[in-house]
Design a protein with these regions (language model features):
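Nucleotide-activated donor-binding/catalytic signature segment of Leloir-type glycosyltransferases, i.e.
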Residues: 227-248
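Glycosyltransferase donor-sugar binding loop
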Residues: 41, 182, 213-228, 246-247
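Short hydrophobic beta-strand element within catalytic cores of glycosyltransferases
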Residues: 283, 287-290
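Conserved donor-binding/catalytic core segment of Leloir-type glycosyltransferases
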Residues: 6-8, 165-200, 216
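Donor nucleotide-sugar binding/catalytic pocket of nucleotide-sugar-dependent glycosyltransferases
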Residues: 117, 121-161
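Acidic donor-binding loop of glycosyltransferase active sites
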Residues: 258-272, 286
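Conserved acidic donor-binding segment of nucleotide-sugar-dependent glycosyltransferases
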Residues: 302-313, 321-326
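A charged, aromatic-enriched C-terminal amphipathic alpha-helix characteristic of glycosyltransferases
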Residues: 313, 326-357
Length: 375
C-alpha cells in the first residue's frame, strides 16, 4: 500500500525553539513511517527561490505549512500559499502562536490584509494551539476547517511517575523553593519581572525573614538583555538569590526541571501561543506562575495549577501570592497528571495524525468520485 506523501514547510532545528521543536518531534516519530515525509526548511529567507522551486516540483498529497507572524514573513507565506493554490495543492497551515490576526489587522497594508483573507479562505484547513485561539481565524475560513492541536512536552522531559510522586512528597517540609524561568530573555517574556521578585525576596530576608525562594534563569539572550540582566544582579547584589544557567538542553535541562519546584513565565509576548516550557514544567511536577495571556488560560487555571496573573497585578501582589502558597505538593502532582494525560508526546502526534488523515481522506474521496464520474 502506497503511503500518502506529506510535505512539511517549516523552520527546522537548529536552532531549537518552540516551533522547530514541534516539527522535529513530528519528523522523528512514527509519522515518518506512516507517511512519506518531505522536508522544506524555510529558516533561510535568502533561499526563497530554492524553497519555491522545491514546492513546485513536489508531488506531495498534502502540504503542512507553519506560518510566520511577522510582516516580512507573512509576505513570503503569501507567495508560497499563492503558488500552492495556483497548482491546486492541498494545504493545511499550523499557527504556532497567537498574533496572526493582530498582524494582518493592524500591522500590514490593506492590500496585504486582503491577500491574507483570500489565502486563508482557500485553505483546506488551519490548526491553532488551543480552543480559545480559534477566534484568530473566525470570519476567514469556515469553523469546521479550524482544528486544535495542543503542544506537548516531549517524553524525555517528563518525569517517571514514581519520581514525580517522590518530588511532590519532598515539598511538604521544604522551606526554600527553587523558582525556574526557562525561556528566551526577551523583555515581553517577563524575565525582568522575575528579577524584581528576586529583589523583593532579598529585601524581605534582610528584614529578618527566612529565605524562601532562589531564582534560576535559563535561556538565550537577545539584543541588550544580557547587559540588563547582569547589571541588575550586580547593582542589587543578588548573587545569593539568582543563578544564571545560560542555554540548556538535554541532560542539563532535564536536571534543572527535576530540581526546581516552581516555574515562572510572566509573559506578555505578542507572538505567544501555548508555551511548551509550561507543559514541560507541569511534566516535572512544578507549580506554575504565569499570566492570562494568549492560549495559556486554556492550560493553567488560577488556584488549580498555580498563579495566573492578570494585567493589572503589581509585582508586590504577585510576590505576596507566591509567599502565601500552601500545599504545593497537591498542585504539583495535579499538574503532573494533567501533563501526562493531556499534553503527552503521543497525544500531540495522534492529533496531528488525525487532522492529516481527515484532509487526506477528503482528497482520496474526491479522486474516487472524479474517477467514477468519468466511467
Amino acid at each position: 500500500m502506497n503511503r500518502s506523501k506529506v510535505c512539511i514547510i517549516s523552520q527546522f532545528p537548529p536552532p531549537m525553539h518552540g516551533l522547530s521543536k514541534a516539527v522535529d518531534t513530528i519528523v522523528n516519530s512514527y509519522l515518518n513511517n506512516k507517511y512519506d515525509l518531505e522536508i522544506i526548511d524555510t529558516k533561510n529567507n535568502k533561499a526563497i527561490l530554492k524553497t519555491i522551486y522545491k514546492i513546485m516540483i513536489s508531488d506531495a498529497d498534502l502540504f503542512y505549512f507553519t506560518i510566520s507572524q511577522s510582516v516580512g514573513g507573512n509576505l513570503r507565506d503569501l507567495l508560497i500559499l499563492k503558488l500552492l493554490r495556483f497548482q491546486k495543492k492541498k494545504c493545511l497551515i499550523h499557527l504556532h502562536g497567537g498574533y496572526y490576526r493582530k498582524l494582518i489587522e493592524n500591522d500590514v497594508s490593506k492590500i496585504q490584509k486582503k491577500m491574507n483573507y483570500r489565502a486563508i479562505k482557500g485553505l483546506d484547513g488551519v490548526i491553532v494551539l488551543s480552543a480559545s485561539l480559534k477566534s484568530i481565524f473566525e470570519g476567514m475560513i469556515t469553523p469546521e476547517r479550524i482544528f486544535t492541536v495542543e503542544n506537548c512536552a516531549d517524553d524525555e522531559f517528563i518525569l517517571p511517575e514514581e519520581d514525580a510522586r517522590k518530588k511532590c512528597e519532598t515539598l511538604i517540609n521544604k522551606s526554600e523553593h527553587r523558582v525556574l524561568y526557562l525561556s528566551n530573555f526577551i523583555k515581553e517574556k517577563g524575565y525582568r519581572e522575575v528579577l524584581n521578585l528576586a529583589l523583593l525576596e532579598k529585601k524581605r530576608v534582610e528584614n529578618s525573614g527566612e529565605k524562601k525562594f532562589h531564582f534560576h534563569f535559563a535561556g538565550k539572550f537577545f539584543d541588550q538583555e544580557e547587559e540588563y540582566f547582569n547589571t541588575f544582579v550586580s547593582r542589587h547584589n543578588l548573587t545569593d538569590y539568582v543563578t544564571l544557567h545560560g542555554v540548556v538542553g538535554g541532560e542539563k535541562k532535564q536536571h534543572l526541571l527535576r530540581e526546581c519546584d516552581m516555574f515562572i513565565l510572566p509573559t506578555r509576548y505578542p507572538n505567544e501561543g501555548q508555551p511548551i516550557s509550561i507543559l514541560e514544567a507541569m511534566g516535572n511536577a512544578m507549580f506554575i506562575i504565569t499570566t492570562d495571556h494568549a492560549g495559556i488560560p486554556d492550560v493553567v487555571q488560577d488556584g488549580k495549577n498555580g498563579v495566573v496573573a492578570t494585567a493589572d497585578i503589581t509585582i508586590e501582589q504577585l510576590y505576596a501570592r507566591m509567599l502565601s502558597q500552601k500545599d504545593l505538593q497537591d498542585v504539583c502532582y495535579n499538574n503532573y497528571t494533567l501533563c501526562v494525560s493531556r499534553f503527552s508526546q503521543s497525544n500531540y502526534l495522534a492529533s496531528v495524525d488525525k487532522v492529516w488523515s481527515i484532509l487526506l481522506r477528503e482528497d482520496s474521496s474526491r479522486r474516487t468520485d472524479n474517477e467514477n464520474s468519468k466511467k
